[in-house]
Amino acid sequence: MLRFTHVLNNGAKRSALSLGRSYLRGFGSMHGPRVAVSTLIKKDKKPNGFRGMLALFVGIGTLAVSGLSTNLYNDQNVKEDPWKSVSVDKSIDPFPTELKAPEFPISTEYVMLGFGIRSVTFISFKVYGLGIYAAKEDLGLIPKVLDSNFLSTAFIDFDSSKSHQENLKTALDNPETSRILINNLLDSGIRLVAKITPIRNTDFNHLKDGLVKSILGHPDSKKDEDRLTNGLQQLRDAFSRKGSVPKNNDLLIELQANGYLQVSYFDRKTGESTTMGQVKETLIGKLLFSQYLSGPKPLSPSTKDSVVSKLVTLA
């Protein structure tokens, strides 16, 4: 012991202290109290012999165990998060896999069908994160519609060598048959929510113009101009609110069982939600959600593909 103390007090003192510093620096990067650790080293640059050095390393060990406990706790939280939320884009908060009142201004409980990003493709400009949710009580409508005898015979189950789910995936990936299948699903009265979360700061006017443009881009929008004109005016009236929409806030568009659209806004910073207005012309909601979920150029291909995968598993 005397020989060890002598070596520690002389030749090995500096390297041992350096080791202590290095270890503490590493520990400080693991969510530990970096300032407190630095202070500890600064106050006791030259530990008093073996006892001083021993005390230093006992302190290191105590902090390390504390840090390890903290990290284990955080790891447990991380493991639980994927069941409750999904990461859509690093610029915005993860999307919850369920939407419930009163946190969100919606009429019932919704579960996620899929998610993705809405982008301006020619410049790869990300506009907003998009999540599509279905009412939990309405999930039974999905197999009822997409596994019906009529649709299965006329549009889905053409390849007898494949399962119904495989044929359904092919049909929903087809621009033409996907329109038919999704329109039938929308006509069933299924309740849906589109959660729109801007990736960059924007304003209500830009969001409104984007929705109007998307609806006008649907080929069926030309079939009934009177209903379309009336419905778009109702949508514009719902966006009478002015001002900015910071990134990471939510615009919620709820397609209700009667075909009405309810437009709401959730301010993440204040935690306040506001019902902005309602669109009673049912054509508007049908065209908008059809654009999200079907056709040759869905508004968000990644969202559409994600929803299709979920629909196939539920059908």
UniProtKB/Swiss-Prot annotation:
Residues 1-35 form a transit peptide. Its main location: mitochondrion. It holds the Pfam family Chalcone_2. One of its GO terms (cellular component) is mitochondrion. GO terms for molecular function: intramolecular lyase activity. Coiled coil: none annotated. Keywords: Mitochondrion, Transit peptide. SUPFAM superfamilies: Chalcone isomerase. It is found in: Mitochondrion. The keyword Iron does not apply. It comes from the Eukaryota. Belongs to the AIM18/AIM46 family. PANTHER family: FATTY-ACID-BINDING PROTEIN 2. This is Altered inheritance of mitochondria protein 18, mitochondrial. The lineage of its organism: Eukaryota, Fungi, Dikarya, Ascomycota, Saccharomycotina. The gene is AIM18.
